[in-house]
Amino acid sequence: MAIVKEITADLIKKSGEKISAGQSTKSEVGTKTYTAQFPTGRASGNDTTEDFQVTDLYKNGLLFTAYNMSSRDSGSLRSMRSNYSSSSSSILRTARNTISSTVSKLSNGLISNNNSGTISKSPIANILLPRSKSDVDTSSHRFNDVQESLISRGGGTATGVLSNIASTAVFGALESITQGIMADNNEQIYTTARSMYGGAENRTKVFTWDLTPRSTEDLMAIINIYQYFNYFSYGETGKSQYAAEIKGYLDDWYRSTLIEPLSPEDAAKNKTLFEKMTSSLTNVLVVSNPTVWMVKNFGATSKFDGKTEIFGPCQIQSIRFDKTPNGNFNGLAIAPNLPSTFTLEITMREIITLNRASLYAGTF
């Protein structure tokens, strides 16, 4: 016979496990991650219909991920690029079938286990947008013109070309030939100029969208996306910590090298004239922008798209957000003074120059 007990408050307290019996293994994330997507619900748009156009719309786009990076040396930036490419490829490969789970992984940071010393463990922003209306890849390089002649090899003088004895003997004739006689015969000394490869230029790319909100959530997403891009494009101003460290090193060196050896033991060794001269280093105002962006194609790709290429690490160079009303009451009813279509244009510039090893992350 089953024993029936009355459900009381004391019985509820005794049921289950005590809270102190275990704890969550998930650690707290100190960095707040701002997420936005257009259209809203795009990440969870794993549509079950057979319409290819619908599913393809939600499975393709651009993913903009922002990180706080303190180190700006070339080695750290190039390793960040390769680490992002390798770690994100395995995650984005699952986007073909499970879009929602992919974005949940992306919200935890694509490179959370790499370069933990210089890169924030979690991204500060994840923005998912459709493919840009303008998709132009531009690579430019710089060349240095090299001009050499006998005069340049001789130190810039005609006498430097020859030895001392020979230059004394022929200098007068050489000077007269180069200055007048050759010109009288319609001739000019010919100097060959060569162009030598000087390296790549920093790449820039323009992303443009015409965003038409179809719901209130879409409208709020557009506003938030613009505000996130705009906010993280600005830097922070403050007093330079590096300059203050330099002041400390200089003061210590001056005190240990000049003051202490030449001063009596009971003499004051601080507040010297040199310290007053270096006091200006404590008030050096600087601007800093640690936000680094990575841009990658999000979704299903094929061999016709070429090799998977990421754009970054880069920073925002300019933003243009056109919200001019195009008539009365053309927008949503909740915001009649806003346009029916917003134009967002973002220009990004890579902060490192690439080479063959870093262009396709060594996969070419």
Swiss-Prot record:
- Gene Ontology cellular-component annotations: virus tail, baseplate
Q: Name one GO biological process term.
A: viral tail assembly
Where it sits in the cell: the answer is:
Virion
- Which signals induce this protein? Expressed in the late phase of the viral replicative cycle.
Q: Which Pfam families match?
A: T4_tail_cap
Presence of the UniProt keyword Lipid biosynthesis in the record: no
InterPro entries reported for this sequence: Gp48_T4-like (IPR024389)
Main localization is virion
* Keywords of the record: Late protein, Viral baseplate protein, Viral release from host cell, Viral tail assembly, Viral tail protein, Virion
Tell me the subunit arrangement: Homohexamer. The tube first annulus is composed of a gp48 hexameric ring. Interacts with gp54. Part of the baseplate macromolecular complex which consists of gp5, gp5.4, gp27 (central spike complex); gp6, gp25, gp53 (inner baseplate); gp7, gp8 (intermediate baseplate); gp9, gp10, gp11, gp12 (peripheral); gp48 and gp54 (proximal region of the tail tube).
What this chain does, per the entry, is described as: Baseplate protein that forms, together with gp54, the baseplate-tail tube junction. The tail tube first 2 annuli are formed by gp48 and gp54, which are in continuation of the spike complex. Involved in the tail assembly. Morphogenesis of the baseplate is completed by association of gp48 and gp54, which bind the upper part of the baseplate dome to form the platform for polymerization of the tail tube.
Question: Can you say what this protein is called?
Answer: Baseplate tail-tube junction protein gp48
- Native source species: Enterobacteria phage T4 (Bacteriophage T4)
